[in-house]
Amino acid sequence: MRRYMVTYAWQLLKKELGLYQFATDIIVMIRVCKMFRQGLRGFREYQIIESAHWKHPIFSFWDKKIQSRVTFDTMDFIAEEGHFPPKAIQIMQKKPSWRTEDEIQTVCNILQVLDSYRNYAEPLQLLLAKVMRFERFGRRRVIIKKGQKGNSFYFIYLGTVAITNDEDGSSAFLDPHPKLLQKGSCFGETDIQHASLRRSTIVCMEETEFLVVDREDFFANKLDQEVQKDAQYRFEFFRKMDLFASWSDEKLWQLVNMSKIERFSYGQLISKDFGESSFIMFISKGSCEVLRLLDLGASPSYHRWVWQHLELIDDRPLKTHLREYSPMERFKEFQIKSYPLQDFSSLKLLHLKKAWGLQGTSFSRKIGTSGDTLPKMLGPKIQSRPVQSIKCAMINTKFGELPKEAAVGAYMKVHTVEQGEILGLHQAFLPEGECDTRPLILMSLGNELIRIRKEIFYELIDNDDEMIKKLLKLNIAFPSDEDMCQKFLQENSWNIFRKDLLRLLVEPRQSPPFPPIRPKKKEIYNPKSVVLDLCSINKTTKPRYPIFMAPQKYLPPLRIVQAIKAPRYKIQELLPQYKSAGVLI
């Protein structure tokens, strides 16, 4: 009995202790949450006062507990996103001979974000990472002064600099469109190799971070030998070209010293408009494509194509596209035909036009009818065709109305530039009235090119009639926008027909084991597949709000499509019908 009482008492005590421990945990959690709320209150107050003190980042207040004034500098808490990593700065503070191979490789990996650094060969990248030092300068600081001897060359890791012709760089802050160099660019390489005088002034437009290579380290670590290998490669490339067959080696080396190699990966943008570029590009390896962003809404062919296909919006069979009369319409038609000497079809159409006006015709267009204009009085045999209306927002173009959703653009390949070809000289010697001023995009397919400034190249070919005759033969006539639009529509029709045929002939796959509970509503434009579906233009769907939308300045001026699904006849009606094998109906 006593043993039973002891066991029972122990169980009660255990339960009470468990409840006590549970209550203790709750109290601790409440206290911790209270401490978090008190701490976050200061952050909320800082968010309120931060914008007010942005112009005066240092402020102070009187602390009653310590009986003294506390000073707070908001600039110490600004996020340093995009700045050069502190770990790499510590490495660059060492002498080049003290840096280990792992540290050099670490710096080399960090610098891969710089396009100008990535264009060098791998051995030269490692040598540059070994001798670089880090510098940070503020706004209006002159980095290079015109007329001075070049002792360093620079890579821009963060910030922007301007190129000017004055000595103090003040004109960069007065010029509305100064020449700018931004992150990833480099300057001063040519002057450091040949110990020449600076031909321009470089000034910081904002706080800028540089990676600097000094002349002493450049030659002490034999970087000049690696640079000479690249120069010899460029010389051999130019010497093999028929364009420079008549040039002497001395003159060709002048071209080599002013040129620079750049490498681009597959799909990388080389130039948004190479016609307006200040460089001439020689394709030394690989190939690239010339693209044109077409505004399809500005093409008369696209305008006709859209409205021809929208006539099939009701999805009727091939020979019964005109919709059948309803009983009420047949009765009204009978009333009109009951008067042998008069035709009231014009009054009927006028009444319909007034009704459409009340409903708002600015957001609709009639298609597939002969009632756009009032018919002439030709007797009682006139039969008014039924009118079908497209209810959607319209925009006015120079070719007429067009559905707002159908105003899209498409990228078209204009030309493929292969190895050994030249870009930037195809319109160099044409009159201004004959030049093609359309913006043309240059996209890499994995290539290497050699750049040289146009003004330098023009100085080298001055008074060289033989060279000018060769350059005149390089003129390329690109197709017009209308021709490219027609080609796009032809390719689009074939691609859609091919998909319809495959969908009809190939057996569908088995349904997935877990079908979606609620299917997604079909939208007119699908940004993932880049397809415009005009079949759904007359259907109302609730807008789906995306989680993230890019700012408008980062988006193209038009919605880009790769294909357009237009209303079309069913492919079963277009294929031949057979009673049996080999016997047509």
Swiss-Prot record:
Gene Ontology molecular function: any one: cAMP binding
Gene3D superfamilies in alphabetical order: Jelly Rolls
CDD domains: CAP_ED (cd00038)
Compartments reported by the entry: Cytoplasm, Cytosol
CC per GO annotation: cytosol
Segment forming the signal sequence: none
UniProt xrefs under PROSITE patterns: CNMP_BINDING_1 (PS00888), CNMP_BINDING_3 (PS50042)
GO biological process: spermatogenesis
Superkingdom of the source species: Eukaryota
Pfam families from the UniProt entry: cNMP_binding
SUPFAM superfamilies for the chain: cAMP-binding domain-like
InterPro entries the UniProt entry points to: cNMP-bd_CS, cNMP-bd_dom, cNMP-bd_dom_sf, RmlC-like_jellyroll
Keywords: cAMP, cAMP-binding, Cytoplasm, Nucleotide-binding
SMART domains recorded: cNMP
Binding site for a nucleoside 3',5'-cyclic phosphate: 116-239
Cited function: Essential for male fertility. Plays an important role in spermatogenesis and regulates sperm motility by controlling the development of the flagellar bending of sperm.
Record protein name field: Cyclic nucleotide-binding domain-containing protein 2
Organism expressing this protein natively: Macaca fascicularis (Crab-eating macaque)
